[in-house]
């Protein structure tokens, strides 16, 4: 039944159509609430989700033909960086598989001073793409940092990889 009587509780099931998703990874959305057919402006449900691919139904043959994400070096040490300096470094991502590799998303976890960019979301077999990480040290304290960056692709064997960036902020 769609009707709750006074003092009753109910369960609301929410289904998300991933086929219509425009982004991958963590996201937040709102659902409008209607009571007796009228929208209640001050009532919205906040939904948090992490959109990831489900590889569980892939056959062995599909897995053998899948892309393979290889990061040439997943750890970069930038050494000492002067406070206020902007620095760019590059992680190289290669598709060692048999079908196109897609970057689903990259999360630096620190968008206020660390941003990621890349020239192509689709990487053909045997090709590579540079993942550029830009560091803005303007508001950072003078300490040593070890920052983790999450890389998510359509590689069914290892869809999520972590890149590490080491640096020290000095005067």
Provide a role label for each language-model segment.
Residues 2-4, 18-19, 78-79, 118-123, ...:
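Beta-strand-rich interaction surfaces with strong enrichment in secreted/lumenal proteins
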Residues 36-92, 96-98, 156-171:
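Long, low-complexity ectodomains and other extracytoplasmic segments of secretory-pathway proteins
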Residues 12-20, 131-139:
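Short, hydrophobic beta-strand segments
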Residues 1-11, 98-127:
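Surface-exposed binding patches on compact interaction domains or structured appendages
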Residues 15, 32-34, 48, 92-94, ...:
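Residue-level recognition of well-ordered beta-strand positions that form the cores
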Residues 19-32, 42-44, 83-90, 138-150:
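Short, solvent-exposed loop/turn segments enriched in Ser/Thr/Gly
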Residues 5-9, 22-26, 40, 82, ...:
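Surface-exposed coil/turn segments at beta-strand junctions on protein surfaces, enriched
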């Amino acid at each position: 039944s769609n009707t709750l009587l006074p003092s009753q509780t109910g369960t609301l099931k929410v289904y998300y159509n991933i086929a219509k998703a425009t982004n991958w990874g963590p996201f937040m959305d709102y659902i409008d609430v209607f009571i007796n057919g009228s929208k209640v402006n001050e009532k919205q449900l906040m939904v948090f989700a992490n959109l990831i691919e489900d590889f569980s139904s892939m056959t062995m043959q599909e897995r053998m033909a899948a892309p393979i994400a290889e990061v040439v070096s997943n750890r970069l040490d930038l050494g000492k960086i002067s406070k206020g300096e902007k620095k760019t470094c590059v992680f190289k991502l290669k598709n060692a598989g048999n079908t196109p590799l897609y970057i689903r998303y990259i999360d630096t976890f620190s968008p206020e001073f660390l941003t990621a960019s890349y020239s192509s979301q689709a990487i053909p077999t045997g090709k590579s793409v540079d993942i550029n990480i830009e560091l803005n040290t303007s508001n950072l304290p003078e300490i040593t940092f070890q920052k983790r960056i999450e890389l998510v692709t359509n590689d069914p064997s290892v869809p999520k990889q972590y890149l590490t960036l080491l640096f020290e902020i000095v005067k």
